[in-house]
A protein has these predicted regions:
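The canonical Cys-X-X-Cys-His
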Residues: 36-39, 83
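Conserved acidic residues
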Residues: 11, 64-66
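Non-catalytic, surface beta->alpha helical segment in thiol-disulfide oxidoreductase systems
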Residues: 79-119
Length: 127
């Protein structure tokens, strides 16, 4: 029996819509392929970092562009690996290229900190 990976495989437009909807949470989205050397070199680091976070805190997801390349088009992904850092349906940052586990962990921490910010006065009044 294999262990469940600490990330979700995104395989449909419905999955993407779930991530991108307002209230969709905090997400690290990795566009990758098995034929991409840097993607495969980063795979273990991605899994390791994903395992360090609670899914309620930040959700790690992967889109295999070989089998689901159509899901990359709306994000204008032209190179892989591409990682998107998303909160509440908004892309806050994008990184193209291999990331170390340390850098990925730091980016995920940054994303979590953005999601935990309390709204300012205007946000409380009009949000």
């Amino acid at each position: 029996m294999s262990e469940t990976p600490p990330y979700d495989a995104i395989e449909s437009e419905d999955d993407i819509e779930d991530i991108m909807r307002v209230g969709g949470g905090t997400v690290v989205l990795d566009f990758w392929s098995e034929t991409c050397g840097p993607c495969m070199a980063m795979a273990a680091d991605f899994e390791h970092v994903a395992a360090q976070f609670d899914r309620g805190e930040v959700r790690f997801c992967k889109v295999n562009t070989e089998t689901h390349g159509n899901l990359a088009a709306p994000f204008n992904v032209r190179s892989i690996p591409t990682l998107l850092f998303i909160h509440d349906g908004k892309i806050l940052d994008a990184v193209v290229g291999k990331m170390s586990a340390k850098t990925l962990g730091e980016k995920a921490e940054w994303l979590v900190s953005k999601s935990q910010r309390k709204p300012g006065l205007l946000g409380r009044l009009f949000g």
